């Protein structure tokens, strides 16, 4: 069968040929980022080698925050301002930056909603970004703990990639 999956206007599974409904369901569960589904798979008895992919979109959800949209996997509590991280040493605009970048940002607010952020806006943004990293770390931790619990490390390679 040929299948694809469209969520919020984006393909999360491009059109492809799938020979097994079980494989299709497994792919969809993993693509949706459900660590619990991966753990459930790891807890099953396997007689053959397998390949498991776990995809997570955080901390990319920082983009929704910048556009004042709800975060798709739940909002994050905002701590008091005095607990937000500081700004990086290279925060100030570099006088040698190309003017074309600022010009492009001024033409397209929806693509660059952070253009007019204040230093405190950036500190809040950075805090949220760090919390999103912590969330995805916790999800990955569930899978790594399942590998431990099932004693699968001698036959397991974990590869982390990111864009």
Predicted regions and their residues:
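Catalytic-site neighborhoods of secreted/periplasmic enzymes
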Residues: 1-52, 56-77
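Active-site-proximal cap/lid insertion segments
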Residues: 44-48, 56-162
């Amino acid at each position: 069968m040929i299948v694809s999956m469209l969520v919020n206007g984006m393909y999360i599974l491009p059109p492809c040929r799938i020979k097994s409904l079980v494989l299709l369901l497994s792919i969809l569960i993993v693509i949706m980022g459900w660590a619990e589904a991966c753990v459930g798979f790891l807890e099953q008895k396997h007689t053959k080698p397998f390949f498991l992919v776990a995809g997570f979109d955080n901390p990319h959800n920082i983009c929704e925050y910048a556009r004042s949209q709800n975060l798709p996997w739940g909002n994050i509590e905002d701590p008091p301002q005095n607990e937000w991280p500081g700004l990086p040493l290279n925060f100030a605009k570099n006088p040698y930056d190309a003017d074309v970048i600022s010009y492009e940002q001024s033409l397209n607010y929806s693509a660059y909603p952070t253009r007019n952020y204040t230093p405190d806006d950036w500190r809040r943004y950075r805090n949220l970004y760090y919390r999103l990293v912590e969330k995805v770390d916790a999800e990955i931790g569930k899978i790594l703990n399942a590998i431990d619990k099932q004693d699968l490390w001698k036959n397991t390679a974990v590869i982390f990639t990111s864009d």
